[in-house]
Amino acid sequence: NASFVEEKTHPLFALRVRDFRLYWLALVTQVVGQHMFAFTLGWLTFEITGSQAQLGLVHLCGFVPQFALTLLGGVLADRIDARRLIGAAQANAAIAMILVGAVTLLGVAQLWHLALGAFLWGLSAAIDEPARASFFPRLLPRPLLRSAVPLISMAFGSSRVIAPSIAGFLIAAAGAPATFLVCAAAVSTMVAVLFLVHPAHSAARPHESLLNSFTESLRYIRANEAFARVIGVALLNATLAMGFIHMLPVFAKDVLQVDSRGLGILAAAAGVGSLAGFISYSWLQTRLTPRNLIVGALTVYNAALIGLAFSEWYWLSFCAILVAGLGHGYFVTGAQVILQTLVEDHYRGRVMSVFALVWSLMFLSGFLLNVAGEWAGPRLALAGGAAIVLAYVWLSLVRAKTLKKLVLVPKPG
């Protein structure tokens, strides 16, 4: 009945499972460290160079390994113990953060140091994202996936609330080097927790060539129109709009004229909105069809970004970012619920690695929007990208018959 379905999809239901609860707490800590690192790296880059284009270049260096290797990470996640992949990725991320912190502490930080730090972090994320997406479903019964996925999204949303504020105040109080070291400690937490959980056994699969394994997953996605539509619009939105978070240093300094604390509050607004979306998603998914939820979320998100682009007032910008975060929370969670619920286990790592390109494309988006902003101004760059996504959503996505009829029934393992 309806009350039973609502209980099973409530995020807190999955936290009753010990292993998933431990993993989720470690994930929150890890992602806080990651967002703090990205925030601090962007702030330091703009502080040292004062160049919007060079800020975009650092983001591009984080994007390249993620975009190039995330799909490989998905193939590896379907054939290697995901726990090993996650542990190795987070150890590498911690080393990168320590190295950037060290050169900053010594006062010798240059643009190439920051670009290298972004590259190493992107390399870690390329392996970590699909491995995590393949790993956490093995920590709890399959019927609880619709409860667990919003919690995973909530981990990212809560970190976006906490991380920018922590980073902004740490930078002001203790400096960037101390902030980088705190980031390294945070991401290392996941490595320790991996030894405390006991995931379900993952059945061995034939080890065909990497290329065949990858092309097989693309055929699988293409054969499922719902997957193709959801992943396609997610990648478009990531490329043209999600990089707005990497433009905030420019809006904060040049348009709104605030310091690192003010920038931290603006960045946190996106997290507050996303967190509100993640928390209320379980209620919303029982009242809207998956298609209507995704279309509505993308509309709210991109309309809010257009509002942000032309805002002259700090608190109006704050509200626009807050609303954008809400739309982002609904969309990302809804898309992942569709994919994680319907995908078959032996394709999970590869399918989710294609979706994980969303996060690496944020760096490309940051690069494109910042370069376009240098040429046409940040307002037109941001509004133009959001307008293109809105046009696609209403001219194409709303007409997709497969999404109209979509019912979320889990595939057997």
Label every model-predicted segment.
Residues 6-65, 223-268:
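Helix-loop boundary and gating motifs at the non-cytosolic
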Residues 12, 211-223:
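Membrane-interacting alpha-helical segments
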Residues 21-38, 61-75, 81-96, 113-172, ...:
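Substrate-agnostic recognition of the 12-TM MFS/MFS-like secondary transporter fold
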Residues 24, 56-59, 86-87, 115, ...:
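Hydrophobic/aromatic positions within or immediately flanking transmembrane alpha-helices
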Residues 42-48, 101-106, 162-182, 254-255, ...:
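Transmembrane alpha-helix termini and helix-breaking/packing motifs in multi-pass membrane transporters
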Residues 49, 81, 103-104, 108, ...:
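Helix-breaking motifs and short loop linkers at transmembrane-helix boundaries and internal kinks
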Residues 68-72, 79, 83-85, 95, ...:
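C-terminal transmembrane bundle of multi-pass solute transporters/carriers
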Residues 134, 138, 180, 184-209, ...:
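Helix-loop junctions on the cytosolic side of multi-pass membrane transporters
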